[in-house]
């Protein structure tokens, strides 16, 4: 499967042994598991380093355009196994470890997931980096080196408890600190302007500011089967003066450590709770911190080889992954004008050819806005620039739509006391893309309609994708080997080749083999559940899985309400013909998101009742997997029978979990939302189960009204029974009010928020019927196996390789740079 003629087994073994000595002063047989992991990781890194150096040299030599992919999150997962696979030396390295008495799985389990992201946004960025390196395109990922990530989730008494995710406590063996590139980032103070006598230009200087030093840490991104090693550059913050000794000596201890704390706070956690002012301020600081450092460094790199910054766009493109890095627009303008001496029009010309924006959400609340007071106080010069961009943009709007105040209200960057980041990104970006066909259509016709009418040429769609190297080759070795046995290993770098499996869909032997692989993966997950949850689950039951961020629009609540309904049905009809079903949830709720956290408690309370009811003979089990992340996700995707993708239609931009499940042979149970629409197009409606309102219907109800959940409550006895159980103590005997907020959210208008905002009761019956169809289909093993195989065979479109090639062709205009073999 791999050409590893370059791999020197003896040298690799020798390196592991010597690493163990030099890092820990121990022989292999004395080291603990973490020390063994570190010793192996450094030995793998040594192999990567030569390619990494060669990559940077070749990039410098060929001087081709580079994309800087800016993202608040990079959900990388574990690096060791992935690097071994992409070096095409997994089996050989595994053999060396066995000779040294190590089990590769135990060693891999010692590595914490890199806590640099939370949800799909960050995982997409990680998949994109994998594809960019594999496809040999020059690229940097730019982000923050969070000390604690978002949080590690623990479940105590059924409640989510957030504890710090101290993923760096043993160090990250794959990163390299680049102290030689310190970059100063300034906050606060005021802007002094003066006229330059020589040039007659107005000059602007930020004074009385507080500063931190951004220090980059570089993490290698290894391409599969190529010599390319790209870089994820994550920034740490250090005080400009490490320690203010004179203040300390004068007894002003507070001031002495102030600078230290300013720096420390910036990189502490991902998405600090912004329910309060200090949290909002910290988020904006984080965004400007990593964007300013990344843009400054990119321009410095450009200037090492080029004199004319007016041609920056020929060599550099900044891709903004969602609105978080949008301040890059104004920061680039600031550098070009204040430091490089360009006039406004020249700087604007460069900026609008260099920056491109990906929109990831239809939810208006997630399109970031900052109070003017906060923005202008924290980033005074940046605010001046945004003000001027806004003034000119509003003039353009007025010229195009005279007297249309409504257009200005919707499109202005600064309006109603707020700075609107999405509007800034669209105004300045040369490309604006959505992440699935339906999502892009909704942006163009609904959410961003005014922008689309004014500048349609900017808008385009790039349907998301996932890397098959992690989510099939690494996550599901049994299935990967089976596919390679049937069609060869070309699918690893060209996922469309999976369609060759279609000739086997009616082959009884292949169907059986596939069911056997799924069964073994379910046994692996059942073992994980027993170990972590203490619950026995039956691998012969249907594994029905919903793992994703916890948000009301993703409707974990619909899922658990249906479980409550199904439980009632089984209790009433003990002889009911139902395939045993294991409902598996995994989700983190944002720390300040009250109803999401109550939903987790509800799921766990329902699990406690159902899992301990012997009278139903194990027909239903409910499992909540603690601290869902990439590494346990890999075990889950491989084992799922049913993929729950049940967001309210029109709300999920794309989703990528749906693709990971499909690639591993799960049946999609979902609404026509996000990329589900395209999955159904690829696999055929008969190989998925679709339910619920369409996005058009949802949007119509939202705009015109006409939906009253109380009507359903009054007329549907089963739904009423389930909702009453939220408040009659069935699942909370010690506190009947515990789930009152959930009950109220479904039935009562609250302020300007409509009852059942996400149409859970409206879609409930349709969902329950869809679940019955799943039950029937699973009873026909041959038909189910055929559907499984068709799902795998139809997943070719959903590789991030395809997505990246589209970005390259339509937006970035990059050229491949082939890295020759390292001698």
Question: What are these language model-derived features?
Answer:
Residues 1-823:
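A conserved ligand/cofactor-binding region detector
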């Amino acid at each position: 499967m791999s050409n590893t003629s370059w791999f020197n087994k003896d040298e690799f073994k020798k390196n592991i042994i010597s690493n163990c000595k030099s890092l820990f002063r121990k022989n292999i047989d004395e080291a603990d598991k973490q020390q063994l992991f570190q010793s192996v990781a450094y030995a793998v890194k040594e192999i990567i380093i030569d390619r990494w150096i060669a990559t940077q040299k070749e990039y410098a030599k060929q001087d081709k355009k580079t994309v800087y992919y800016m993202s608040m999150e990079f959900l990388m997962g574990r690096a060791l196994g992935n690097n071994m696979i992409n070096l095409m030396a997994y089996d050989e390295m595994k053999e060396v470890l066995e000779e040294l008495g190590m089990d590769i799985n135990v060693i891999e389990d010692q590595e914490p997931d890199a806590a640099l992201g939370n949800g799909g946004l960050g995982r997409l960025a990680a998949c994109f980096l994998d594809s960019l390196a594999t496809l040999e395109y020059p690229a940097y990922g730019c982000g923050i080196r969070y000390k604690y990530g978002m949080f590690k989730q623990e479940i105590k008494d059924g409640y989510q408890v957030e504890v710090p995710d101290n993923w760096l406590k043993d160090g990250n063996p794959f990163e390299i600190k680049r102290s030689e590139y310190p970059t100063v980032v300034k906050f606060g103070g005021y802007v002094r302007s003066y006229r330059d006598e020589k040039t007659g230009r107005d000059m602007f200087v930020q004074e009385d500011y507080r500063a931190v030093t951004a220090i980059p840490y570089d993490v290698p991104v290894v391409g599969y089967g190529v010599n390319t090693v790209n870089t994820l550059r994550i920034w740490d913050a250090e005080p400009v003066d490490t320690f203010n000794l004179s203040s300390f000596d004068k007894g002003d201890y507070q001031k002495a450590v102030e600078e230290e704390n300013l720096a420390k706070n910036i990189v502490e956690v991902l998405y600090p709770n912004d329910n309060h002012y200090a949290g909002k301020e910290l988020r904006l600081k984080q965004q400007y911190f990593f964007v300013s450092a990344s843009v400054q460094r990119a321009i410095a790199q450009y200037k090492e080889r080029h004199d004319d910054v007016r041609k920056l766009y020929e060599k550099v493109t900044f891709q903004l992954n969602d609105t978080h890095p949008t301040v890059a627009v104004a920061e680039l303008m600031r550098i070009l004008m204040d430091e490089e001496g360009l006039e406004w029009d020249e700087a604007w010309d460069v900026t609008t050819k260099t920056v491109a924006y990906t929109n990831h959400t239809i939810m208006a609340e997630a399109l970031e806005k900052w109070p003017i007071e906060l923005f202008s106080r924290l980033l005074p010069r940046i605010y001046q620039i945004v003000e001027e961009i806004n003034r000119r943009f509003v003039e353009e709007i007025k010229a195009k739509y005279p007297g249309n105040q409504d257009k200005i209200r919707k499109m202005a960057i600064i309006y109603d006391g707020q700075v609107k980041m999405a509007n800034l990104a669209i105004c300045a970006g040369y490309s604006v893309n959505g992440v699935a066909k339906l999502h892009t259509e909704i942006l163009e016709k609904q959410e961003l309609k005014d922008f689309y009418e004014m500048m349609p040429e900017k808008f385009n769609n790039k349907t998301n994708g996932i890397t098959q190297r992690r989510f099939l080759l690494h996550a599901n070795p049994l299935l990967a080997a089976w596919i390679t046995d049937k069609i060869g290993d070309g699918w690893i770098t060209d996922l469309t080749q999976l369609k060759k499996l279609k000739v086997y869909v009616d082959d009884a032997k292949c169907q059986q083999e596939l069911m056997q692989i799924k069964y073994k993966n379910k046994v692996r997950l059942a073992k994980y559940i027993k170990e972590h949850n203490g619950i026995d689950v039956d691998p012969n039951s249907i594994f029905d899985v919903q793992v994703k961020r916890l948000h009301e629009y993703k409707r974990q609540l619909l899922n658990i309400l249906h479980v409550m309904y199904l439980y009632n049905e089984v209790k009433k009809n003990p002889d009911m013909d139902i395939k045993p079903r294991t409902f598996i949830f995994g989700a983190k709720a944002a720390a300040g998101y009250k109803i999401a956290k109550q939903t987790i408690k509800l799921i766990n309370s329902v699990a406690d009742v159902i899992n301990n009811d012997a009278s139903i003979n194990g027909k239903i089990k409910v499992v909540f997997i603690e601290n869902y992340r990439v590494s346990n996700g890999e075990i889950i995707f491989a084992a799922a029978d049913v993929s729950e993708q049940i967001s309210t239609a029109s709300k999920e931009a794309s989703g990528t979990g749906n693709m990971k499940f499909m690639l591993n042979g799960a049946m999609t149970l979902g609404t026509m939302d996000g990329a589900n629409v395209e999955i159904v197009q690829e696999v055929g409606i008969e190989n998925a189960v679709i339910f619920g309102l369409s996005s058009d219907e949802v949007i119509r109800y939202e705009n015109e009204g006409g939906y009253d959940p109380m009507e359903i409550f009054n007329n549907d006895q089963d739904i009423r029974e389930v909702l009453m159980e939220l408040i009659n103590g069935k699942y909370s005997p010690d506190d009947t009010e515990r789930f009152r907020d959930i009950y109220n959210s479904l039935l009562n208008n609250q302020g300007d928020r409509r009852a059942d905002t996400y149409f859970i009761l409206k879609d409930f019956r349709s969902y329950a019927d869809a679940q019955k169809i799943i039950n029937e289909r699973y009873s026909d093993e041959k038909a189910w196996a055929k559907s499984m195989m068709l799902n795998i065979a139809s997943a070719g479109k959903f590789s991030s390789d395809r997505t990246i090639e589209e970005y390259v062709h339509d937006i970035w205009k990059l050229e491949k740079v082939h890295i020759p073999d390292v001698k």
